Amino acid sequence: MSSSTSQTTSRAGRLTLPVEKRMDAQVAELLERLQADAVRNSDGTELPEIVNKLATKIYQTYFVGRGDQDWAQTHPRELTRIYLMSERTPALADGELSIDLMTNWFVDQVYPDTDCDVERWWQVIDRTTGDVIAPGAWHVDPAGLSVTMDQAQAGHVYTVGFLAVQRWDPTQMYNYLTNGWADDPQRIKESPYDIRYPQTWQHVRHTLDQWLADNPQVDVVRFTTFFYHFTLVYGSDGTERFVDWFGYSASVSVPAMEAFEKRFGYPLQAEDFIDEGWYNSPFRVPRKSFRDWISFQHEFVTSRMAELVEQVHAAGREAMMFLGDNWIGTEPYGPHFAHTGIDAVSYTHLRAHE
């Protein structure tokens, strides 16, 4: 064997090539030149038919918590939620004070959840004193976009911590806006749904089984990723306002918080997630409630991961997880990750390999 052949053989494999339709010639040429051992699609792209003729593994992106917009639209109460804080609003005089909720938030992405028990799950706080304002001293205005206090104190600054519905998945939103998908009439804005709701969880499981049956050519299911997105919220200008790769602010729901109280014996409040507007950033010392929430969600997410991985294995396929996007609760360094049964973890940021 020549030295050049030996070098080529030693380089083969361990490389995944992202491909899409209408690039058949380029796919074949790149696979040969780069010695890639697998191909995959990406968010918003589809695999070309030519991949079925290539002697290589086929990975296909699979979204668990979005992609079925019919389900999302017919189950709006089962979309994912996020805790947000209004702008800090000063009272210039004693008496009534109106606080706008959506100032500087992107209305295409989020809107206030007024279907929940707002007196239980929202909070108004005097940031000057740190006092929580009793629910009876404020009310949500009819349009659901502002809160009015009855007796604000002049010179004091107030905020509203509110539960918001995520109407647009953050990653799909980013790709949609960045790539100009608005010009493509076939593109739709995808809403994320929450598997904490039993109906949605059963729908997710059934959909995966059907997808596996309909796609026998796929060797590896590349989950991208699972259920809860890291904190990524846009401002009113349609650009990133708050991003936290480790953020848990978007992993909340009323059923989850109620289950948390039963498990840990104490209730959560909006401020446990809002954290004075820091949203439990990694630069903050985590409080007990936040550490408990991470533990609680990690255990839940990994248990559900294991069930989906088992479905994939039962269909004779491998299961891979992309370390990003909806990765909250899947942390490989967490104590329950080893029990998920996942076959591989991929990470592509700033790298050309998986």
Model-derived features: positions:
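Active-site-proximal loop/turn and secondary-structure-junction residues that shape catalytic pockets
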Residues: 45, 64, 225-227, 323-327, ...
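Active-site groove signature of glycoside hydrolases
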Residues: 215-230, 277-291
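Aromatic- and glycine-enriched glycan-recognition loops and surfaces
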Residues: 198-206, 293-307
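Aromatic-lined carbohydrate-recognition surfaces of secreted/lumenal glycan-active proteins
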Residues: 17-18, 222, 297-331
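Mature N-terminal, pre-catalytic/accessory segment of carbohydrate-active enzymes
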Residues: 1-209, 214
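Active-site-proximal, well-structured secondary-structure segments within enzyme catalytic domains
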Residues: 248-296
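Conserved beta-strand positions
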Residues: 39-41, 223, 347
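Conserved small/polar residues in nucleotide/adenosyl-binding loops
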Residues: 348-354
